[in-house]
């Protein structure tokens, strides 16, 4: 490129400036930030300090394995420099800095995954302070700034300047100003009505509120004036210097005035002679004050820490705008030493189960030195919503990711963290209201834990809450269910489905409800995976009411009656199986139906209808498994239902009656739908129903219709076998 060949002393800087357009979503976000009124604009400073802290974390982590990375600047700090004259606020850090490519990509041309989600949240009325959670905190600078300049130096690149007034584009150029060594300087050119953020008191207030627990010194630079007593000679010297400065700044018309002042001073000198008088002058100086001297909160005694302090630390750690729901602060001593401070947020993040998201939100420290915040081995994935810090005394400072994977120390820390998290959830469960909030947000995590963590499955199962056929609008634990079980009840009965109403009205729960047996309603897709692993609770087996072999508490008389019904309908079962062929594995007399004529159940080890629906929705499903697992369907018939009884009579009177076949297929397809399955050929089923409607309305099938296209559809309908006998069809209804 031509600009690369130009030397710095060539006055061709304009050609070195490159202009880029903001990516559409980012431009939209900036427009939203600039043109909407937000009352809590102060969060911009929290976001920029947080970004600086992240940059410092990165260079410190790199320096652990390669100390030469800090040759460009050993001190790791953040400086805040307000300038009232220029109306600028500058945030400087000695972090990792950005290359030219980083500047272009990170600040404008590549949208983060959270950009769109944040805009949707904002438009839905969410608070602007959520911005950091979506990874787009930098743009909050435009809440207070009309123009932002970013000067940055990375060890692997030259010093560059990025600049934008948010007009849909930004510029990047090589920076020829004062060399930075390494790091990033964000200069905010404040709007006229936002000068409060140049006030010392206001900056201190914001840092204390949002950033006092940042792990690097945050220093405020403020220009102040003080009185200084000096002798006349020194005062004159100082005044001369000031006059020199004025000479440079003022135009030529000011020159005589300056000369007059000088001659006056000479006269004064003559009058005073050798007398040396003391004189007070105003001296400007830069005051530096560290704003976050607070000791790391996790190293303090939990008894000395207030809820407010925990809340402030949680907010500074997570950029959350709400308080935490629960906190666990503990230390482990003995062979292994570490301290941990864990928080449960009030709500799940928008991308909780996204694969691209980092696997956990716990910062790992070694002897108060930050190491990393995305150590996957620190906590299992199902606890990825837990926020906090872990500070180990035993891990080496220069530990690498590879070493962490093999570290026995880390395995012990992980085991302890999981144990303490489960303790925290159990404590939370004692407060019904708070646990309800927790469970609404994180029930999927608990269920994922049951699927993945065999060691803690029992403890996790105690945290489960479900609606049941007897609980109304309240969710109950498995322990509550067990205390309400009937005397002769051996199993915990459950049904899986899409909604509470759907499973409550299901044919599968009819007889259980009639007998006063409580059924658990599992209505989240993850419940299917959860119960695959959770076989029993407190010695009671979990039994799906939609699978074959359902055993209900029965007395001898009921068993005898059931056997008689099986014998009576044995022939009909055989005929139905022959008609349905491979569609079902078998046809049996049901002991679970009361008002429905029939239902489809699955084999003990096959998928339920709900699981089949979930698996069909998987984009990367294995069709061979689909065929194997989904094929095991059993048709159960209700021997007490008039439709089934009449069908038995028809079949026994004339087993070659052609209407029987069509009715059996219609019953099977309807049972598929009512049992939660989908039809392979819905149109054929619909045509059968239309034919039934015609018969019910007494319309002659051969009647010509006004619309030729309708006639064509009628021709394609599958014929109702034996439809010459309409009266027999009506008899079944």
From Swiss-Prot:
The modification Phosphoserine is found at residues 231, 252, 263, 454, 477, 642. It is found in: Nucleus; Cytoplasm; Melanosome; Cell membrane. Residues 285-621 are annotated as: Interaction with FNIP2 and TSC1. Preferentially expressed in pituitary gland, brain, adrenal gland, and testis, in comparison to other tissues. It is an enzyme of class 3 (hydrolase). In the resting state, through the dimerization of its C-terminal domain, HSP90 forms a homodimer which is defined as the open conformation. Upon ATP-binding, the N-terminal domain undergoes significant conformational changes and comes in contact to form an active closed conformation. After HSP90 finishes its chaperoning tasks of assisting the proper folding, stabilization and activation of client proteins under the active state, ATP molecule is hydrolyzed to ADP which then dissociates from HSP90 and directs the protein back to the resting state. ATP binds at residues 51, 93, 112, 138, 401. Residues 285-733 are annotated as: Interaction with FLCN and FNIP1. The modification Phosphotyrosine is found at residues 314, 493. The modification N6-acetyllysine is found at residues 58, 84, 444, 459, 490, 586. A motif (TPR repeat-binding) lies at residues 724-733. ISGylated. S-nitrosylated; negatively regulates the ATPase activity and the activation of eNOS by HSP90AA1. Keywords: Acetylation, ATP-binding, Cell membrane, Chaperone, Cytoplasm, Hydrolase, Membrane, Mitochondrion, Nucleotide-binding, Nucleus, Phosphoprotein, S-nitrosylation, Stress response, Ubl conjugation. The keyword Chaperone applies. Residues 629-732 are annotated as: Interaction with NR1D1. The keyword Signal does not apply. Residues 730-733 are annotated as: Essential for interaction with SGTA and TTC1. Its EC number is 3.6.4.10. It comes from the Eukaryota. GO terms for molecular function: ATP binding; ATP hydrolysis activity; ATP-dependent protein folding chaperone; nitric-oxide synthase regulator activity; TPR domain binding; unfolded protein binding. It holds the Pfam family HATPase_c_3. It catalyses: ATP + H2O = ADP + phosphate + H(+). Residues 9-236, 272-617 are annotated as: Interaction with NR3C1. Molecular chaperone that promotes the maturation, structural maintenance and proper regulation of specific target proteins involved for instance in cell cycle control and signal transduction. Undergoes a functional cycle that is linked to its ATPase activity which is essential for its chaperone activity. This cycle probably induces conformational changes in the client proteins, thereby causing their activation. Interacts dynamically with various co-chaperones that modulate its substrate recognition, ATPase cycle and chaperone function. Homodimer. Identified in NR3C1/GCR steroid receptor-chaperone complexes formed at least by NR3C1, HSP90AA1 and a variety of proteins containing TPR repeats such as FKBP4, FKBP5, PPID, PPP5C or STIP1. Forms a complex containing HSP90AA1, TSC1 and TSC2; TSC1 is required to recruit TCS2 to the complex. The closed form interacts (via the middle domain and TPR repeat-binding motif) with co-chaperone TSC1 (via C-terminus). Interacts with TOM34. Interacts with TERT; the interaction, together with PTGES3, is required for correct assembly and stabilization of the TERT holoenzyme complex. This is Heat shock protein HSP 90-alpha. It comes from Sus scrofa (Pig). The lineage of its organism: Eukaryota, Metazoa, Chordata, Craniata, Vertebrata. The gene is HSP90AA1.
